[in-house]
Amino acid sequence: MDILKLAAENSPRSKMIYHEDTQALHIGTLDKHCYFVPFAKGQDPFEDRKNSQRMELLNGNWGFRYYDSIIDLEDDFIHEKFEDTIPVPSNWQLYGYDKPQYTNVCYPIPFDPPFVPDDIPVGVYQREYDYSPDGMDRVLVFEGVDSCVYLYVNDSFVGYSQVSHATAEFNITPYLAEGRNIITAAVLKWCDGTYLEDQDKIRLSGIFRDVYVLSRPKMRLENYIVKTILGENGSARLEFTVFGCDVSAKLCDDDGVTMAQFSAYDGESVEIKLENVKLWSAETPYLYRLTINAGDEVIGEEIGFRDVKVDKGVVKINGKAVKFKGVNRHDSYPDTGYYASYEQMKADLVLMKKHNINAVRTSHYPNSPVFYQLCDRLGLYVIDEADLESHGCVEVYYDYKWDYSDYNGIAMLACDERFGNAIKDRAECLVKRDINRPCVVFWSLGNESGYGKNMLDEAELIKRLDDTRLVHYESTHCLDGTSDSVLDVVSGMYWDLNGLKGYLEKPEENRPLVQCEYCHAMGNGPGDLEDYHNVFYSNERFCGGFVWEWCDHSVPLGKTAEGRIKYGYGGDFGERHNDGNFCMDGLVYPDRTPHTGLLEVKQVYRPVRVTKGESEGNFVFSSTLEFVNAGDILDCRYEITDKNGIIYIGRVDFDIEPMGSTVVNVPNDTAEYENETFIRFIFTAKEDTDYCENGYEVCFDQLRIAEGKACKVAEVKENVKAVETPLCITVAVGDVVYRFDKRKSAFISVKFGGRELLDRPLQYNFFRAPTDNDVMKYNWYKVHLNDFDVKSYGCELSASENRAEISVTQSFGWSIQQPFCRLKAVYVIDGSGLDIKCEAEFSNKIDMLPRFGIRLFMPKDFSRAEYFGYGPTESYIDKRQACYIGRFAADIGDMHEDYIRPQENSSHYGCRYLTVSSEDTSVMFTAGEEFSFNASQFSQEELAAKAHNYELERCESNVICVDYAMAGVGSNSCGPRLAEKYQLEKPLINAHFHIQISKI
């Protein structure tokens, strides 16, 4: 028994003692340093790192054993049989082990820091490693493990590390034997670090970034720091500091021309003076190449000369005020979970650049080190964020406590001295690894973790480690005092426009302001982006914002019988707690198909804007580019159009200095235009770039140049025959027969040439399938906008030879409640069609009426829609920048925006007319003013009822909604209430619709 006890006490399992110890964060790891991969002398160090002879990538299938609980882990688990395999990198939940969980704020475990549940799930990874002694060390590198890792080589315990998104390096040389070796990594789902990693994401586990072994000489370069200091007239200084050994170095431009050669001794800083330096910015991502020779190793470093500072409350890069047109990004992919390959990361960043995004916040943890190299090359500013978020503290006493300095609320761990070292460690992991990346302009302490001594200490540590960048943190925007001394910018989330404007009026505050999260892009949104843009550009102290967020998060649930991916979200995985589809809040779908919200971002972030000049034919081109002449990179053509199509096409040359304007003349005589006429300027890429091809459409602007005449219905005189019975009114005019039900006060039939055009009665429509931003939807259901009874107070018919008029008074409501709407309507039927004029008075109990209009269920063969209005994609009063006014046509089946959680979609704003047609019949809709419409194969009831898009069932009819008005979509899912100017006016609405039926 004593032998067994001794074996257990010295077993691999016995070494697992650090994951609840906030002072034991990294055991047996090497010191933190800047990211680099050495190459062998004679190799090109700027090639793909996988080509380095000094790097051995261990990605691939590893042996795997999963344990539901650490209690089940054998004492000598490293010698158990590994029958299963799993890809590395990956997350084990994607391979049938354990299950994903989506939680936003709430912790996935009981709040009892630093302790975690006894039943911690464990994934044990194992693989062989061949070793031939050659005098060099073998350094095993993990770039990302969630949540912590215990490492063993052969029978020996090597070490432990936490911080999921930080690099951990172990010198495994002392534990290796010549020939075959066994590497075992035991990964725990939770550790004390879990309390600091409560990010809003689907919770997954495992080795999720690259694993590799570096072969390094005993005496080697351990670390180096590159600083660039800009001078005057194109001069600059390069400050280079090395640690570990002496080096020689050569700096070349991107053509390979040598700019400088120098040497540096271990621990020495060398300063190199340069002239005619090309500067790095998001618009001009010029990189020099620094080749570092250290013994028989060679290291390649790309250097961007740039500086970032605050000048009189303005963020400036290279001396120029900048605006961040940014987005927040998580590592999230439906097939690979947290693992982001080089190709996936590059595709994300290319897509951002193609949509005029110039900045990214790594919410809320450091990304792969390769990600930053891509940002350097493509040109994106980065807020680099520490792996820190503890907003789950707001829930631990059963209520939301968002007082950022309250120990009993969100700031609990920010004030807990047990976590002080852990919080500083996360900052050190961040800064030391990424310190040489020019794309990084802000260091961020983390996200939503309150404020206390630990955060102050973290900020001061970052300042000591790097004085060349700005320090950012959102959770102190409402505090004064110590935050002023360490935070260079004030940061906020989801402020409304008045809050932004009010910031400038604070006499005690003179720092820049950034919205590190704004315009929540969940579902059909964001809808107020243009307004924020206008405020950001109203004052230089506003340095822009970062839309939340880049992608919808999802773990697929399989495929439908038709092969369609079933994207899952919170609640689909059988979790104890979940936050539903709140993770579906991106500008792109999980597969990176753009939402219409991304198209909106592209247009709002456009580099050139056009307004009318003072004289006819003159237009003012204004650039929002800060470093580049827009005329050097963009071509411009224009189209003059009216409701009949394109009238004229031309091209213009232009020249605009950065942040400047110029006047362009386009000869045109507006007196010649009978119809409402528009000019649209289209700006395209002048040449190929790293992210787009020559001719790619970068942006556009459209202006009305002639008012023209409104769409009027031609008067047609035909004989009208009206017959009234106690229950019904029948009106016949030409080939059209209308039947009006007096009890329901509704048209129950419209026949043309004997063919029925209505599958259901024509209805008034007050409801829409709630968008994710429609947080007031519970009021809509309470008032029963979606499900109501109709009361008719009277129906009168007056008829003449060429006209029939039906006047009704009615109300809409539900049992128990007072009517939510009282309506008077006059229906006029004549040879030109059906004319509807109504006056609707609404109850003040309705919280933000979503729409008012009419709805028709038409036969399926009425499948083609043509309209003159905002298109070609969905558009709303506050979400239409990506659209332009024109004549568009589409099959109704193609007019559905397929949000993963079904909701209102594909409305079209600002329409002058709409026709819905079959092969031989056309139904034309107009209104007294511009209107919105929606044509869909799905009813709003179906969209509202189903939780996933793959559950939707098409209606037996095509559903046509013609709206006097549709409320905006906003971003209220996690942002301010919809602005009043985008709401429907109440309590009284006067609306006018006209329906005309004709033969094609």
What is the role of each PLM region?
Residues 199-220, 562-620, 624-632, 639-643, ...:
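Catalytic cores of secreted or luminal carbohydrate-active enzymes
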Residues 177-180, 241, 246-309, 672-673, ...:
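Extended acidic/polar, glycine-enriched regions
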Residues 151-153, 234-262, 270, 618-652, ...:
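Beta-strand-rich binding/interaction modules
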Residues 5-14, 30, 48-49, 63-69, ...:
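Accessory beta-strand-rich segments of carbohydrate-active enzymes
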Residues 86, 94-98, 103, 144, ...:
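Beta-strand/loop-rich accessory regions of lumenal/periplasmic or secreted enzymes
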Residues 2-50, 88, 103, 156, ...:
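Extended substrate-binding grooves/exosites of carbohydrate-active enzymes
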Residues 2-37, 45-49, 158-159, 182-215, ...:
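Glycine/proline-rich low-complexity spacer/linker segments in large multi-domain proteins
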Residues 94-101, 106-115, 172, 176-246, ...:
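An acidic-aromatic loop/edge-strand motif
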